[in-house]
Amino acid sequence: MKLKMYHDSNCPYSRKVLIMASEHQLGDIFDFVSPFSKAGQETLVEDNPLAKMPALVVSPGFAIFDSRVICRYVDSLRKNTPSFYPAEGEALWRALRYESLGDGMLDSAIAARQELTRPKEHQMPERLEKQLAKVYAGLKCLERELDRLEGPLT
């Protein structure tokens, strides 16, 4: 049975879920629904009151949303591939911390891009600088902790 996933191909969080599924050889488990299609618009808010991408309907009347939660769910479906998440302890908390750091950097990069798409007269350089500073701080954090990361970096 395929799982209904509300998915926008321009959404980096949707792509994050697709990468997780692909790494676990589960890329064919989704039945994609565009939030912009008539069918998607009619059911999205019923399944996900926040109407954010991605959202995954795992059983009738029960959807999970937020890419972090969906990635954990997809990771739990794996069969012949190792988990992306350590089982417990500090290693798990580090992995979740890196995931949060990556999502936060992505949030800031998106906010910076949105600022640049505003009409020039409405742009706020301070906001752009603040968002980019968060991205750079996240990169510096990863650089400092590079020796703690295990496995191949892709």
Residue ranges and their predicted role:
Residues R78, L146-L149:
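A general structural signal marking secondary-structure boundaries and capping sites
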Residues R127-L146:
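Amphipathic alpha-helical packing segments from all-alpha helical-bundle domains
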Residues M1-R127:
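GST-like domain detector, emphasizing the conserved glutathione-binding G-site
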Residues G151-T154:
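GST superfamily/GST-like fold recognition
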